[in-house]
Amino acid sequence: MNRKTVFRNVLLVAVVLLVIYAFSYFSNDTRDFKTVDTSVAISQLDAKNVASAQIDDREQQVRLWLKNGNDATDGKTQILAKYPASASEQIFDKVEGAGADKFNTTVTQESWLTSILLFVLPMIILFGIFFFVMNRMQGGGGRGGVMGFGKSKAKQLTKDMPKTTFADVAGADEAVEELYEIKDFLQNPARYQALGAKIPRGVLLYGPPGTGKTLLARAVAGEAGVPFFTISGSDFVEMFVGVGASRVRDMFEQAKQNSPCIIFVDEIDAVGRQRGAGLGGGHDEREQTLNQLLVEMDGFGDRTGIILIAATNRPDILDPALLRPGRFDRQIPVGAPDLAGRRAILRVHSQGKPIDPNADLEGLAKRTVGMSGADLANVINEAALLTARENGTVITEASLEESVDRVVGGPRRKSRIISEHEKKITAYHEGGHTLAAWAMPDIEPVYKVTILARGRTGGHAMTVPEDDKGLMTRSEMIARLVMAMGGRAAEELVFHEPTTGASSDIDMATKIARAMVTEYGMSAKLGAVRYGQEGGDPFLGRSMGVQSDYSHEIAREIDEEVRNLIEAAHTEAWAILNEYRDALDLIATELLERETLTRKDLEKILAGVEKRPRITAFNDFGGRTPSDRPPVKTPRELAIERGETWPEPAAAPVLVKAGAPNSGVPNGGVPNNGGLPNNGNQGPSNGYAQPSYPQPSAPQQTPQPGTPDYGAPAGWSAPGWPPRENPSPTYPGQQSGGYTGGQNPTPPNQSQGQYGQPQHGQPQPDQGQYGQPHPGQQAYPEQPHPGRRYPAQPDYPVQYPDGGPFADPNRGNPSGENQWQSPTPEQPQTPPPHHSAEDDGPSTARWDGPDGSR
């Protein structure tokens, strides 16, 4: 409650009290009489000093108008005295015998209205207080005041609110393009309806926290040009039974009155959680609310013109009935940005801030792999706060570097005092991590190593990937195991006993090894089997109270395989440190003197360290002998072998406005329909142009004679076999060309990397949390065509009347240079998984020091 509201309430109470006092004052006709004792009034009656008298029987008082005032009445001639009910006859006799000129007796009787008011008024006051308290508990009761418990709390955005557009969104270009189509459908429905297209009824934005799901919804609100209602999923859950379902009904009734419109439900997992039996046979109020939401989204009634946009970071717990097409037709993953996205986000958040021209934002974008947009905004803000703390005027490279360390590891513990021996142990511990990682061939080089205490760690070593990756091989995971055990091995090698500082390293190594055995099938003994399926009661978090789906013998073998992996990594780390003991001592000496070493320093110190061979102890394929035949080469590698120049990616995708000439074929491009005859259409009906080849090196496609031998038995056939020679038609979001060798592109609307379905054994530390939420989605891979080359740049001439979401040249770029690029074969679309010893760093691998806490 603010100060203005308090002042208003106090003033209202004061006015009411003043009115009551004024009413009682002016309605009292005895205010001119002096109240005296009963004995004084009787003495005046006995002295016959009374001119007139009036007896008020109900009030049991007598009014006397005296002939002369005296000392007993303080000179007043109008006096008032009270008397008991038993003395009424005596007072009447006294007045009658006083010889007054006149006297009167008034008997006041209550009216029926007064009696009713005296009975009802206290009840009205009590009910008023009750409803006031309930109104305060319900936050105003929503629409309808006190009786509006069942009314919707959805708020309609007005023109006075700050407007966010798609130009303010950076690092989520695919999500922007998907949502822009909805905005274009609302503003230009004719060209979609001419093709029989229907607008998506629901759009689900899912992904980890801080990636911009709510920001995308605000951008849709600023661009749509239709009524926009926003509500939180928790607003449906109240203390009364049935309130949630009633609010859902009222929200959609409100939306129908403003159709066409958009409803945005933030954190829909609060109401859309998967239904279950309930514990103890009880009733869950969320189920009733969810059932009403399902009916309103796609039930018997009409819902034309209402688009529901929802956001969640827990798609795995949503009810399958809520995710089916017809309710949420489009499910858009919003993951962590890639390198180009991080560049754009840093440009947006650094706009308007005095950044030093020598500050390397490009390098900062490379060092922050896996960070979300919120993390990057926090990095820039922390750098500004650090600069202000030091009374600086320009944000320098050092401030940006320190801000990254603060966001990843926490603030420095400058006041911590440690002994020289503990400092030496920390130096060797972090040096062991660094040297082990430097000698392994399948791990990113160490970017920074420090023994400064930060957050809950006594030191850490960071590895930064050179580029974004979405896959991890077995040798890479073993290399991370070796790095994790490097600190423990250094303590045992130098000080002949381990310390508690390696607890977080052991925890990280155990997680990696167990994931290799149980999730990724990287154990030759147990095979490619997933042990420990996710499931269980949704009310128990899907993991509590659920028995393992494997036997005790398998559990014992899993433990043995995990231990063997960690022991092999421990032995390898010991061998590396023992072989390069001089380099380990040199790293420890430099850390004791300088406390922090960067990659440039490490390159000088570890110049003589050679890469170790890959560990093959666990590469047991059984009777399956790997082939010596190398994999096929990419179109880029083939072009380089032929001496041709591979074209650089274009600066931006081609966005052609409706009605523009030659909208189906870009200028200077060669129409390509896969060698099939032209049917007369200017372009594909889905709005995506066929890929074009740079001239004059476009390949000539020649038919392949005969049918290739696929190794099927003679005379054997099946539906769809043998495969057709002609390529299958493409689908929206797919590339028309495929990699030589038949690697399938990613299906549309399917997330890659960390928050999508893994491809070809992609590691997933928490695959269920941000996996594909809809189990019924299918991929439609494209059949490779012989002779087809991968295009240099995917070309999307989407015909939007206003030029599309990327028509603004200054979008996400304060300098005015348009650097947005659609993904290419050389530009991965997803960030690599985090390689962190404690599994809490958002961007880099951190191997903590021996402080005993992590």
From Swiss-Prot:
Any GO BP annotation: proteolysis
Pfam families, per database record: AAA, AAA_lid_3, FtsH_ext, Peptidase_M41
Enzyme class: hydrolase
Keywords: ATP-binding, Cell membrane, Hydrolase, Membrane, Metal-binding, Metalloprotease, Nucleotide-binding, Protease, Transmembrane, Transmembrane helix, Zinc
Binding-site list for Zn(2+): H429, H433, D505
Superkingdom of origin organism: Bacteria
Cofactor(s) needed: Zn(2+)
Binding site for ATP: G207, P208, P209, G210, T211, G212, K213, T214
Stretches in topological domain Extracellular: 27-112
Region (Disordered): 658-854
EC number: 3.4.24.-
UniProt-listed PROSITE patterns: AAA
Residues of the active site: E430
InterPro entries given in the database record: AAA+_ATPase, AAA_lid_3, ATPase_AAA_core, ATPase_AAA_CS, FtsH, P-loop_NTPase, Pept_M41_FtsH_extracell, Peptidase_M41
Membrane topology term: Multi-pass membrane protein
Gene3D superfamilies (alphabetical): 1.10.8.60, P-loop containing nucleotide triphosphate hydrolases (3.40.50.300), Peptidase M41 (1.20.58.760)
Biased amino acid composition, Polar residues: 812-822
Bilayer-crossing regions: 6-26, 113-133
Cytoplasmic side of membrane: 1-5, 134-854
NCBIfam families registered for this protein in UniProt: FtsH_fam (TIGR01241)
Role noted for this protein: Acts as a processive, ATP-dependent zinc metallopeptidase for both cytoplasmic and membrane proteins. Plays a role in the quality control of integral membrane proteins.
Family classification: In the central section; belongs to the AAA ATPase family.
Subunit structure: Homohexamer.
Protein name (database record): ATP-dependent zinc metalloprotease FtsH
